């Protein structure tokens, strides 16, 4: 489906047109329907919208779609486009009028392109008439160009509309399947309910088992057995009703099943119709590549004709030479005879193709109308079946469950009676506790009594079906009487104790009652035995509440103190920069001067101590200083005179300084411009380094992907090698087996033919040599001997037929095991074709099994099934015609070397595929080896590796500030984060900035770019010719010399103590 704007795409099912919009534009489902009405003029009640999986689009789905779209906008991501398919309910009636009404806004009538005005013009026309014709032809040309563009747009739109219409049919079929699935699910639920009842309530189960059980168990709370609570006649009637309901439901469900099967057949016909329509109406944009090419040539031709026309119209006949006028006339004739007919032909061709697309679309719409009508009929049938049968089935199932409960009461009665006894004991115990509690507490009796009544009502509702069996004595009046006087309760009920209940449970165990029922009674009795008449005190509750509140206050106080302590700790850590994470303001490198720098006061004391030493030493030379003072006074006088002279010169210099101020301003501007250019160059260099890092990572990722692909290919090659070897082995075994079988068959045929000829010869000799008497005497012996020979020949013939069929069946299994299927062609001629996935259904044990019996269901060939049927018939009839027919079928299979040629060709294809895979693997292996050879190493460098060399930052003299900080970087030997140091002031006026390469000192060291290798540095040995004029280079390491920084070792780069560094000799290989 083509790209549309927005996150919602609406598709018109009958026209195939689509519209893109945003779902958040609509507030409600009705707003979306109004948008559909405006676009496609479908009445609101007739709009029917489906989702891509066939479900009906409802308000809940619309709200979910809107909420997801809003969430996607809030998160700043683009939501995937949802597709909805819009149908017109009127089209499901199947009428042509509904189709015409639904497509009246979509129907288009194409107009055939008109002929050019130049077609009817004469060859020789006047100047004025020619100008008029050419001007008119320009208008015709513009109209034709518009028509051609429209025709081509119609063709492209038809391809997309066809795909949308076929997709709408598929979605509608899924909708019908979902609708039918709901009905089938109801049917299966009903059938399972009936089967469950049939399994739980088997015939005579309650008579054979439960009746004997009830007659055995004593009703300990009353006289007699439990059977006194059961009405046997009522149970018999319930059994008869159950059987009748089962028969009635089975009949109704079979009718319902028939309706579902009929509907399934209709759906299958609709699916086949949709599939057949999709096969007949197939089109693709690639089928119209010629039209697109013609459209491109058409544009060029139109452009050329317009230029030629303007050239002719712009000519001035009064000033044009005769030669130019002659060329204009020839150009006019050529245009009339060649260009204009060609343009008209292109327009007519596209008109014809567009009209054909319109006709095809109208035909497809009529086909869709029939399919929509069939879907409506199928849906109506489903609804009728549901309304007519399912409702009655539900009523009968409800009655079936009710009857089942009556029968199940018999089997549940022992357990319920046990619960009844336990409840009697609990009530007796409760009343005793209440009587005792009443003397002490009278205020809470009403609430306790109310809870007891609620519990009794719940128990009665849980076992309401047994209410007519057990008769409760109403003690509510006596409970009310309890509040009027202080006399204890006197309720006439049996006295039940725990021993009685335990005796009843033991009786159930002796009668083989289910173990889970006994466990239930024991558990319930255990709970009731622990029952205590306890009433909660409101005072205790209030105290508990107060203690809980105080504990909550203490917890909240501790939480506040913890929050304050965490805030103080955070402030302390924030003020201490040494605890900050590693970054720009806090380096993770070791500061060797930390806590070792003298304070300001210490420095002042040291300087004071040095000045005192100098004074003491100066006293020893006081005399010399006095003589020097006299000389200095003389020089001072001379200097004063010189100062006067300099003052005069200063006045003149000031005037010169005023003039030099302007020059200084200009110099500042120039210097600022140079600094800006220098900053740009530095930024460019940083960007280049980052690009190199990214390129190296990308290269490594691609290399890893290539390695994984090569490993996968190697695994595939090994798999195909083993598979080819297995197939070759199977081929050789089968060919050898087939050759042996054929040789044995031919030898047996030859022996049998020889025996037949010999027997015939002996028979003829005996017939000629005997006389009438001997004939009479031996007439009873010769037929017997001949009959024996004939029977032996039949037995031999039968074995030959079995051997021939076994060889044939083995050959068919061989073919299907290698993916070949024996079938019949259109002319009933045998052919062997390649079928993908055929080998998956073949059991490998067929090949290894030595048994002559082959499972015919595993063989997919229809020809094999036909031959097997002939062979089976031949075993029964042994007729001559059947034998000849059987042999002729086998001869058709082996004639013209069809079997041998197919097997050899199949194995040849497998061998060619293996060779192709080996060739591809060899090529990819060479690519990987080349990549491994050319990859750049960034850590654990060795001799022979390729490495990226970059210059380090800073001047060689500034060891402590620039070089040391650069070389101490934990990321690599090159500092990629700090800017370059400022240049000396004295040389600023001599800087010359080139437009491509920044200034670099010759003594700047070069280092290898490494990643994540701490404590090791690699520096390039001095080689001015190798790095001259380069910002970086890729080199191959020739040799490496290891150094470790200690007190006496070599340390030209002022590295910290303990640092390991290598001096590398490399040769430049290439530049990336």
UniProtKB/Swiss-Prot annotation:
This protein's GO CC annotations: Atg1/ULK1 kinase complex; phagophore assembly site membrane; vacuolar membrane
GO process terms (BP): autophagosome assembly; autophagy of mitochondrion; cellular response to nitrogen starvation; cytoplasm to vacuole targeting by the Cvt pathway; pexophagy; piecemeal microautophagy of the nucleus; positive regulation of autophagosome assembly; protein localization to phagophore assembly site
Positions in coiled-coil regions: 615-804
Keyword line: Autophagy, Coiled coil, Membrane, Protein transport, Transport, Vacuole
UniProt main location, coarse: membrane
Keyword hit for Phosphoprotein: no
Subcellular location field: Preautophagosomal structure membrane; Vacuole membrane
Example of a GO MF term: SNARE binding
InterPro entries, sorted: ATG11 (IPR040040), Atg11_C (IPR019460), ATG17-like_dom (IPR045326)
Quaternary structure and interacting proteins, as annotated: Homodimer.
Protein name stated in the entry: Autophagy-related protein 11
UniProt source species: Eremothecium gossypii (strain ATCC 10895 / CBS 109.51 / FGSC 9923 / NRRL Y-1056)
